């Protein structure tokens, strides 16, 4: 069971919505059927699932266990990429803080996904 505060969940949702917006903005720039477009599609879907779980939306029950499990990989990928990128910046810098917030949000998303998978 997750013990995140409402503030933590709201902040995570804000970050997730921002990431979804950026992903949807670049979506048309990739050619149909390319690996980049496929990865982006999976990332967007995973973020929408995470958003539904964190916010407690009713449609979260519409996701099957397999969909939830598939959503873990893109979330873990975001965490990994942000951790690597954050190493390039000084603690307290704008970029460091931005990556830290994204890591925190994705950690929350991952926890909600894992909890939901374990319930099924």
PLM regions with names:
Residues 46-62, 85-88, 105-120:
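Amphipathic alpha-helical coiled-coil segments
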Residues 7-24, 43, 67-83:
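Short amphipathic alpha-helical heptad-repeat segments
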Residues 12, 26, 33, 50-52, ...:
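Low-complexity, intrinsically disordered tandem-repeat tracts enriched in small residues
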Residues 25-38, 59-63, 84-97, 118:
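Charged, low-complexity interaction regions
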Residues 1-8, 114-120:
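Terminal, compositionally biased segments
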Residues 5-8, 17, 24, 31-33, ...:
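Polar/charged low-complexity regions in secreted precursors and cytosolic/nuclear IDRs
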Residues 35-45, 69, 94-104:
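Short, charged, amphipathic alpha-helical segments
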């Amino acid at each position: 069971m997750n013990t995140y505060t409402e503030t933590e969940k709201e902040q995570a949702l804000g970050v997730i919505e921002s990431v979804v917006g950026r992903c949807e903005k670049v979506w048309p720039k990739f050619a149909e059927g390319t690996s980049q477009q496929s990865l982006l599609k999976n990332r967007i879907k995973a973020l929408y699932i995470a958003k539904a779980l964190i916010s407690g939306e009713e449609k979260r029950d519409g996701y099957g266990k397999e969909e939830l499990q598939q959503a873990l990989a893109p979330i873990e990928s975001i965490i990994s990429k942000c951790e690597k990128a954050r190493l390039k910046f000084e603690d307290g810098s704008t970029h460091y803080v931005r990556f830290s917030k994204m890591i925190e949000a994705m950690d929350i998303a991952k926890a909600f996904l894992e909890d939901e998978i374990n319930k099924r």
